[in-house]
Amino acid sequence: SLVGSEMCIRDSEWADLSIKQRILKSIIFWKMAHNKSIKKICICNDSSSAAFFNRKYQTMKFDRISDPYVSITLTLPDFRKDNAVKEDAIVLSHIGVLSERKGTLNILKAIKEMSVVDRNQFVFVFAGKIDLDIKDEFYRLAAECSEKYRLIIKDYFCSYEEISAICKSSNVLLIPYLNNSQSSGVLGYAAQFNVPVFSPSSNMLGKIVRKSKLGYISSDVEILGIKTFLESCLLNKLMTIDGQEYLKLNTVNSFLNTLLN
């Protein structure tokens, strides 16, 4: 028998699909649900969608599977101290593979449009390999942003230890993803270090952040929405979160139990 994994198309997303796409998706899910060779269909981090598809296709094959996080138990370096970042500076970090669909360029464009303030008030960290498709524009925008604010750029595949040190020292993790129909590994870091994320409010990513109370959600994660949020960080007390609920649901053991049982 086979176990498959699938990203779901939620009710709110059907409106964005053409009639042809809706029919095609329905056929694919129906075939998976009624294929005797498939024992289980796992939907990452979304129990309500699993229940929805079980009702729709009169089966019990759909099941939520956790998005396991890497537990960090190492003694981490002090990112702020090592990079001469003041303790009262607001550190906003964007981590992982940096690409257009992750909203990387929109973040830079938003920074560029921000009202000029003391450059020591904000530090923006971009940590992760920059996608070749956006590399030239990334560095052009980064150079312009650096005239007003401090940017720390680590354009390579960062170790878990380095990413963890960055997250631990951050005030907010920026995940204004344009493709928000799936979970994100950044949530595991946010939950472990109790650092809020700034996320889209829609689709699966928004639902997870909202349900687990992992940070800020916004219906606008384009340039204006990001700019508005960044400027609000100076005006309002920054959010604190407790990631324990998310961590309990997304252990490696939970992932393996769903996969193997």
Language-model regions: role of each:
Residues 172-173, 196-200:
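Short hydrophobic beta-strand element within catalytic cores of glycosyltransferases
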Residues 222-225, 234-261:
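A charged, aromatic-enriched C-terminal amphipathic alpha-helix characteristic of glycosyltransferases
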Residues 18-42:
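Membrane-proximal helix-turn-helix segments that form the acceptor-binding/catalytic region
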Residues 85-102, 108-111, 124-126:
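Conserved donor-binding/catalytic core segment of Leloir-type glycosyltransferases
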Residues 165-182:
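Acidic donor-binding loop of glycosyltransferase active sites
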